[in-house]
Amino acid sequence: MKNSKYLETKMVEFKDLGDERGSLVVCEGGQDIPFEPKRVFYIFGSDDTVVRGQHANRDSEFVLINVAGKSKVKVMDGLGNEMVYSLNRPNTGIYIPKMVWKEMYDFSADSVLLCLASTHYDAGEYIRDYDEYVKAVKEAESQF
């Protein structure tokens, strides 16, 4: 698994600064996550039969946080390695580096999946075909 990008994918835990009034979770760019967020979006209203994502990004890094409900995230590196993460606490997330295939699924009815991205949206940096992704990964691996 030399240079496997999925090995760089990791769970992150955020500070819960709450008190008797409730919870307050803080996520600061460049401190709690390894980039300054340029884009924020969220996914909700998906049920447990829906699969979202199904792409890799050439230039964007992400942190995904289920701020409500739960979901699962499968990451793949194009070299046969994969890992599944369960997101079910609003103070934990998953960091996903560039060029990692991601699929989000098994959404609970109340799921709100918050996504922080390191770049502004650019449709050209998305790889939406898995075979094309595997080819790009293998080409990059052959240069090492």
Regions found by a protein language model. Give the residues of each.
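Non-catalytic, conserved peripheral segments adjacent to functional cores
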Residues: M1-T92, A109-D110, L116, Y121-E132, ...
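Well-ordered alpha/beta subsegment
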Residues: R89-G93, M99-D106
